[in-house]
Amino acid sequence: MATATATSERFELAKHCSSRNWSKAIRVLDSLLAKESSILDICNRAFCYNQLELHKHVIKDCDKALLLEPFAIQAFILKGRALLALGRKQEAVLVLEQGYKSALQQTADVKQLLELEELLKDARREIDGILKSHATESPQETPAYHSEKSDEKSDKLDNHESGASSNGNSHESSSELGEQSKIVSFSKVASKASKQSDGNSDLCNGSVYKEKENGKCGSQINGYYESCKPCNGSDLHDNLAESSDRFGELSINGNKISIKSSKMSHKAEARCGISDESRKNKKYTIARISGTHSISVDFRLSRGIAQVNEGNYTKAISIFDKVLKEEPTYPEALIGRGTAYAFQRELESAIADFTKAIQSNPAASEAWKRRGQARAALGEYVEAVEDLTKALVFEPNSPDVLHERGIVNFKSKDFTAAVKDLSICLKQEKDNKSAYTYLGLAFASLGEYKKAEEAHLKSIQLDSNYLEAWLHLAQFYQELADHCKALECIEQVLQVDNRVWKAYHLRGLVFHGLGEHRKAIQELSIGLSIENTIECLYLRGSCYHAVGEYRDAVKDYDATVDVELDAVEKFVLQCLAFYQKELALYTASKVSSEFLCFDIDGDIDPMFKEYWCKRLHPKNVCEKVYRQPPLRESLKKGKLKKQDLAITKQKANILRFADLIGKRIQYDCPGFLPNKRQHRMAGLAVIEIAQKVSKAWRIEWRNSTKGTTKNGKKNRRRERTNILSQNRGGAGCSSSSFSETSTGYASLEDRSSGRSILSWQDVYSPAVRWRQISEPCDPVVWVNKLSEEFNSGFGSHTPMVLGQAKVVRYFPNYERTLTLAKSIIKDKLSVRSKKDKVIDLSKDEKIEKIMRAETCDELHNIVGEDFWVATWCDSTGSEGKRLEGTRITCIQKPGRLGYDFSIRTPCTPARWSDFDEEMTSAWEALCTAYCGENYGSTELDALETVRDAILRMTYYWYNFMPLARGTAVTGFVVLLGLLLAANMEFTETIPKGLQIDWEAILNVEPGSFVDSVKSWLYPSLKINTSWRDHTEISSAFSTTGAVVAALSTYND
């Protein structure tokens, strides 16, 4: 029976070959090879592929044949012909030479030997001809001509492969602030489509996706988490990759169709989401006889494919419609039409056609793969992976399908699976630059930075003009805070193509992160001259806002709000633009007022601030909060005086000293860019705090010598007089609000009693205000000024792990945090659920299992649900009392692989009260330590108790986390300011890899924190009294406008 079936199939094969119906012949060969692997049938299938000009399929079948029989001369001949057709002449010569040697070493068919010899001569002649023609061209023209022509020819002949083919086309799709991409993964890079406009794509935390519609592509920006910026350390806008808007060519071969992006030397490539090879291992030889109907069908299929390659999708669909009218279940035509639909973004129709093709021929690997790609473009990643996995059943270890599935796994944030798929793909296709790029992105997300860099560099090594790889590598370096390398990569992109707007956007981001906002504005303006994108508009608006050019800032914010979005994830930028426009108008109205009156916490409505912090839709804010007056009124109200903007010699001296001190705040850790604007802000704030505290201590000391210490201490506790803001009824203002408590310098000594009334909040408020004005788009606000949300525990959130992704800035603290969480669980024998219920862990040896857990995943599996544990801080002011520190949380988000492991610090009224009392006690202890016999001392040894008191106060501040954002930098700024007030200057840098705020958070005892920090801090202190010679900051930079000018003016 089996023999009869085989004979029947052989007869059918001969019939299809005679009628030139190569597609059906391939299907018969697939069937035969599924039953028995035959070298002859494999070569026959390669021959059929050759007739359809599916050269990459020819090569793969020949490679299979040569694995089974290293002396299969026919395989060498077919492979050599395929390589020649692809323009890979040097490879062809190597293959043919190897075949010729093999033929000579055995008793070979003389006809085949002569055919090999002739092919080899022809190939060598072609190479010689190319070299001669190149020698006659000018040095400048030769490289360009060779690059473009050879690539174009190669891709045209190579049009049947998927984007995952060995030429490594990139497949994009857009992702940014949300987790899901909203694009079509099908891209077109055929030479005739070169007239279409370039598309764009974005990349965040390393990921890249792309959206294409009617020749237009849109990029998105990534969202960022509260304390932690998207991994690149700069908050948002993390996706950069310029890609060509062209699509690859399409071909059909038996059960498959392929589309492949061509290599573009001037544009970043867009990986065509469709590709294929559906072979199950089968083939046979072919004769040639005519069969008019079959020839007609194949001819129309070829025409349809050609139309797809030309970008004429409507015509292609019309041709396929005619074929399907005659044969409604013809799988090749269904795949072709589905592909055309996919390019038109009619993804549902495309999926329907691919589904019908699968129903008609369940072994049609190409249909499974293309449907997977279409589903991935819709964000249906689970279903997409299922389809691609099914395709691998019919094409085991197919590099094309593995490449495709690796990309989908990457987009679905299954980075581990992505690495596995792409690594296997690259073992077979070592020249797949797209696979290397995505492998680099996946490794970066997993925190394997060395491997990520190597993968990106390998992609560039394969094609030095591959813009996508350069952009991803630039983004990678930016995330690690290696700005020099990032800028070098961007320069490489612009040398290849200076019209890539994403390169200017990324360079703008780097300059923004470095605090060079005016340079960022220049780059973003160039980017906007190329393409009007929401990313560039928003970022340029925020830069204008920071440097005090409020008219331009408002214009860009308005333009951001008016942009027609091509992806829902970008809506968050429009929300932020709304809030920041209001804040720009508020700041504009304050430019001529004293900087003390710049009071976001007191002037801005609590609801406005909450919605801004959470990036919520501003609808409720518009309805319930009084809006800022128009810009004309704000600017009229706050007209700047020229002397405010002038940098006098006196101001220049202060700025030099401020820059020197400010650099000391820099963390030497991955992800933290050296921001010169933030350094200057910190330096000026340090000096102001030192001046303010020094004056208060002098009064305290004078009073203590008069025997009035008791009254002074009492005064620090008493309720303070608030200075009313000058902006009642302004932007998002609450008419009944009051300013954050602040005390002017002059008022310190003007009190009737002559006693100091500085509180701990008076000490920290200047640092908070400077942080707010230095980067006005960061929501730095006091948490207790956030109305009802404060009661439900609004606070900061700092993730170390997000699913499988490791957050570059904070993951270094993961091991210590996990160890601390386990020790707390062992101590308490329980954890808390998301609903704040106690989860008992004292039974079933759970504690023992928890102590053996090495990852947060294992910890979550043992507990069995989302949970949190709270750290604590031993009180210094009230012996035996414990304050609630931060909450170490481990949760699993719906649809996300892995677990989110982070610290969250809620600030409820009860907790605020506890820390307020502790901070008051710590501040009083510091004042007592300095204002007694140590007052004015210039001996470091005599000031040790003062230093310890400063560190204890800093410890409680970090654990308190009273700000929605910015607690870390303001804490260290105040520490430096207090040391300077006591004549001690920190002259070194924070040790490499150390984040001082985490040192406080992960130590439950203040003494442990003090001992840890003093080991490197104290040896770096020197006595400095010359700082007192500088003019008071409140006098030199008295107005808000003068402060903004000081932060925005640099000699370079």
Curated annotation (Swiss-Prot):
Knockout or disruption consequences: Severe stunting in cv. Columbia.
Sequence ranges of the TPR repeats: 39-72, 74-106, 297-330, 331-364, 365-398, 400-432, 433-466, 468-500, 502-534, 535-567, 569-591
Membrane topology (UniProt): Single-pass membrane protein
Record field: transmembrane: 966-986
Swiss-Prot/TrEMBL keywords: Acetylation, Coiled coil, Cytoplasm, Endoplasmic reticulum, Membrane, Microsome, Nucleus, Plant defense, Repeat, TPR repeat, Transmembrane, Transmembrane helix
Region Disordered, residue ranges: 131-181, 704-739
Gene3D superfamilies: Tetratricopeptide repeat domain
Bias kind Basic and acidic residues: ranges: 146-161
Tissue: Ubiquitous. Not detected in very young flowers and older siliques.
PROSITE patterns: TPR, TPR_REGION
Coiled-coil intervals, chain numbering: 107-136
GO molecular function: molecular adaptor activity
GO biological process: defense response to bacterium; negative regulation of defense response; negative regulation of DNA-templated transcription
Subcellular location as annotated: Nucleus; Cytoplasm; Cytoplasm, Perinuclear region; Membrane
Modified residues (N-acetylalanine): 2
Assembly mode: Multimer. Interacts with EDS1. Interacts with SNC1 and RPS4. Interacts (via TPR domain) with SGT1 (via TPR domain). Interacts with the TCP transcription factors TCP8, TCP14, TCP15, TCP20, TCP22 and TCP23.
Name this protein carries in UniProt: Suppressor of RPS4-RLD 1
Native organism: Arabidopsis thaliana (Mouse-ear cress)
Gene: SRFR1
